Amino acid sequence: SFGRPYGCVITSKKIIIISANIDASQPWRRSHCDNIIYTDWKRDNFLKSIVSIIGRDTPPKSIGVENDHLTIEMNNKLQSIFISSIFKDISLNLMNLRMIKSQEEIEIIKNGARIADLGAEEIVKHIKEGQTELEIAIAGRDRMEREIAKTYPNAEYMDTWVWFQSGINTDGAHNPKTNRKLINGDILSLNTFPMISGYYTALERTLFLNS
C-alpha cells in the first residue's frame, strides 16, 4: 500500500472498495463493485471515506474487522469514531470463506500450476556451470509471464517471480537471488511463483549441478 491504507466496506446493501488517489481508477477497473478514491492531502481521509459509507450518526451495532490486517493505530481511530459499535474480529471467518473456491478460481489455480511447471522447465534448460542465479531466474520468470499473457490476454501482469539459489545461498528458504555463478557440485534451490489475478501457485524443487 506504500503507506496509504486500502479497504473494502461491506454492508447489508452494498460493497465498496476504498483506494488511494495515486492508483486512480485502476482498483475500480479490476473490481466488481463501487469504488471511492480518496486523496491524502488531509490526514485521515481514508477514515472519512468509511464514515461516508456507513455513517457516523447511526452506525451499525457491530462492525467486523480483520485484526490481522488492522494496525493498532487504525483500530484505535475506528473505535474513537464509532464509539457505540461493538468491534468483532472476523479474520478467521473470512479466511475459511476464502478457502472455498469457485470453478473459475480453481481453473486459475490449475493454470498456475501448469505455468509454474513451464517456468521450472525453462530454468532447468539454463542451468550450467558459470551461469548466474540472476540470469537463470530471469529466464524462468519471462517464460511464465509470457505464458500467463497467452492464457489470460486481458489480465494485468504483476508479481510473478522466481527464487533460484545455489551453493551456500540455499541455506535459507527465502534468500534473494544473487549474481553468484554456479559451480559444479552445487546444490540448487528452484522456486517458481506465477501470479495470476492475485492467485499465486508455487513449485519448489531441490536439484544438484553435476556437469
Range-by-range predicted roles:
Residues 1-211:
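Active-site neighborhoods and metal-handling regions in enzymes and metal-associated proteins
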